[in-house]
């Protein structure tokens, strides 16, 4: 049975327990009696209200969901807990977000930073960093707290990055914090900025432009489905993962990104870069389609080499943007297809209500004509199906470890799986349906086992109904990629105090937070101050 409990320290009279899909329950601390090392099933059910009685015992406690949950009283030398045990063994779900841990202390105990920064920003610099033990190279964004005008706003940037899981989004791996700085440890991209490539080449042929723009519209579709507006789409904020011709691009810098709600899309903060900013942003009342305007400007630039709106100063540029007038008159446009020009027009529509959205852009005839790829071999072989089967048989703790390994793996080792995932993601939502995966396997000539639907449920580790990028990688990852370095990465996530050993409490630390993040619980103690115990054998 799955088991979740919350420790109450001696100076706290109440604690919070969490049940999957249910609101938090307040429980009064049960005072210690005799210490024991065993867990005893109580004679009563969990009520969810404060527990109080003369004998300090668990009495008259009822379950809110008696069909699925029982309550237990746990006693040992350090604490006493209410245990919430699920009667079902198949509902243990977890999210990769919970593995992106935050640490306090000296970053240089773990990483060697390059002397020269890779890039500079308003609040800090990005350096190349090398893991001292594993020799893995990462990128570290170093942000000065003194220069940050709004630290909560910066923490929202971190929160947004933790929630994103897409092949075209820069991957946040962990964070550090000391008294003066905040450090974001991310994937290292070595291929340079999209901006630099535009400067070097001048313009792109349509086939390559379609390869780039499909990725941009796909990642915008992914963000907008999750009610996130980037608000600073420009070529400087896209990096090539490596220097290869077919390298994917990664969107970076979520410093201006913001959440919007389903009822009122409007945002009011003026944000963006003059060449790429949408007219509505200048008025201080705009919606998520400001990103589509910016994408349209970027699209225009990569086809001809210069922006649609220009001037000698920011004031002149913004004046041109407000008018929204541009043309395709230069000789550079002579050989550009009408379909490409039409897609640009749909992005650069002044009326945001009539402006195309990212999902519609992906279905535009231009992509069908150009196919938007380099004919990558995306067929899955029998080994992928076998890896799925093997993953489904793993213990829950092993699945947690495989998810960490998939997240920590660099894209060099995952090129084929990444191409397969993007191919299967037909609607550009950044995740795939179970039917899309089945169709892809069948189209590759593979015979599916009779219990394949059950197997798919095992791959969908967060229970969302769709298979996310890291979920797919964790299940499809070939065991030959399980290097000692990656295995140690998984070990280090669980080894909270970095003493080279993993205790039951440390396993519970990580697993508890993975569960909390899955259910979007924000009201919980700091990691270093709480100990959670979970039935890890379940």
Curated annotation (Swiss-Prot):
Binding positions for Ca(2+) 1 per the UniProt entry: 460, 462, 464, 466, 471
Subcellular location(s) of the protein: Cytoplasm
The keyword Hydrolase appears for this protein: no
Residues holding ATP: 118-126, 141
Recorded GO MF terms: ATP binding; calcium ion binding; protein serine kinase activity; protein serine/threonine kinase activity
A Pfam family per the record: Pkinase
Requisite cofactors: Mg(2+)
Motif J domain autoinhibitory motif per UniProt: ranges: 387-395
Domain EF-hand residues, every copy: 412-447, 450-481, 482-517
Motif segment (J domain EF-hand interaction motif): 396-405
Ligand binding (Ca(2+) 2): 495, 497, 499, 501, 506
Domain of life: Eukaryota
Region: Disordered, residue numbers: 23-70
Bias kind Basic and acidic residues: ranges: 56-68
Domain-related comment: The EF-hand domain 1 cannot bind calcium due to the presence of a Lys instead of an Asp at position 429 and a Gln instead of a Glu at position 436 preventing calcium binding. The EF-hand domains 3 probably binds calcium constitutively when calcium levels are low, while the EF-hand domain 2 binds calcium following an increase in calcium levels. The junction domain (J domain) is composed of 2 motifs that maintain the kinase inactive. The N-terminal autoinhibitory motif acts as a pseudosubstrate inhibiting the catalytic domain while the C-terminal motif binds the EF-hand domains.
Similarity section: Belongs to the protein kinase superfamily. Ser/Thr protein kinase family. CDPK subfamily.
Role according to the record: Calcium-dependent protein kinase which acts as a sensor and effector of intracellular Ca(2+) levels probably in part downstream of cGMP-activated PKG kinase. In the mosquito midgut, regulates the gliding motility of the ookinete which is essential for the ookinete to invade the midgut epithelium. However, another study showed that while required for ookinete invasion of the midgut epithelium, is not required for ookinete gliding motility.
Name of protein: Calcium-dependent protein kinase 3
Organism: Plasmodium yoelii yoelii
UniProt gene name: CDPK3
């Amino acid at each position: 049975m799955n088991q979740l409990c919350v420790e109450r320290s001696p100076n706290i009279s109440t604690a919070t327990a969490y049940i999957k899909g249910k609101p938090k329950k307040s429980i009064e601390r049960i005072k210690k009696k005799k210490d024991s090392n065993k867990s005893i099933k109580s004679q009563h059910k969990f009520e969810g209200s404060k527990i109080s009685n003369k004998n300090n015992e668990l009495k008259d406690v009822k379950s809110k969901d008696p069909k699925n949950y029982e309550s237990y009283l746990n006693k040992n030398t350090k604490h006493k807990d209410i245990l919430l045990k699920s009667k079902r063994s198949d509902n243990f779900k977890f999210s990769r977000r919970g593995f992106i841990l935050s640490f306090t202390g000296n970053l240089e105990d773990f990483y060697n930073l390059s002397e020269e920064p890779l890039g500079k920003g308003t609040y800090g610099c990005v350096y190349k960093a090398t893991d001292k033990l594993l020799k893995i190279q990462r990128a570290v964004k170093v942000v000065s707290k003194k220069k940050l005008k709004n630290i909560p706003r910066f923490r929202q940037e971190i929160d947004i990055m933790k929630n994103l899981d897409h092949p075209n989004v820069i991957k946040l791996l962990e964070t550090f914090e000391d008294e003066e700085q905040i450090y974001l440890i991310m994937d290292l991209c070595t291929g340079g900025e999209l901006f630099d490539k535009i400067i070097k080449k001048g313009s792109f042929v349509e086939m390559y432009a379609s390869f780039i723009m499909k990725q941009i519209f796909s990642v915008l579709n992914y963000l907008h489905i999750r009610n996130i507006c980037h608000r600073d789409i420009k070529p400087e904020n896209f990096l090539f993962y490596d220097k290869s011709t077919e390298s994917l691009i990664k969107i970076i810098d979520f410093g201006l990104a913001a959440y919007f709600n389903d009822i009122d899309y409007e945002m009011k903060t003026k944000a963006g870069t003059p060449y790429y900013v949408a007219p509505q942003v200048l008025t201080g009342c705009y919606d998520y389609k400001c990103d589509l305007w910016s994408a349209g400007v970027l699209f225009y630039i990569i086809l001809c080499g210069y922006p649609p709106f220009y001037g000698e100063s920011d004031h002149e540029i913004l004046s041109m943007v407000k008018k929204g007038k541009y043309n395709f008159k230069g000789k550079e446009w002579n050989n550009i297809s009408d379909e490409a020009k039409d897609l640009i027009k749909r992005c650069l529509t002044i009326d945001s209500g009539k402006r195309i959205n990212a999902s519609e852009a992906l279905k535009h005839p231009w992509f069908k004509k150009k196919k938007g790829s380099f004919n990558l071999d995306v067929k899955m072989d029998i080994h992928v199906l076998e890896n799925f089967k093997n993953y489904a048989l793993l213990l829950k703790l092993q699945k947690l470890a495989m998810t960490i390994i998939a997240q920590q793996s660099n894209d060099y080792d995952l090129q084929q799986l990444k191409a397969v995932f993007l191919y299967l993601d037909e609607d550009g939502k950044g995740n795939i349906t179970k039917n899309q995966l089945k169709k892809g396997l069948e189209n590759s000539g593979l015979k599916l086992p009779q219990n394949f639907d059950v197997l798919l449920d095992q791959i969908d580790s967060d229970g969302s109904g769709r298979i996310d990028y890291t979920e797919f990688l964790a299940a499809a990852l070939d065991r030959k990629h399980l290097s000692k370095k990656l295995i140690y990465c998984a070990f280090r996530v669980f080894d909270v105090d970095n003493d080279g050993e993993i205790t039951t409490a440390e396993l519970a630390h990580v697993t508890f937070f993975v569960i909390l993040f899955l259910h979007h619980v924000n009201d919980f103690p700091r990691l270093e101050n709480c100990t959670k115990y979970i039935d890890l054998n379940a």
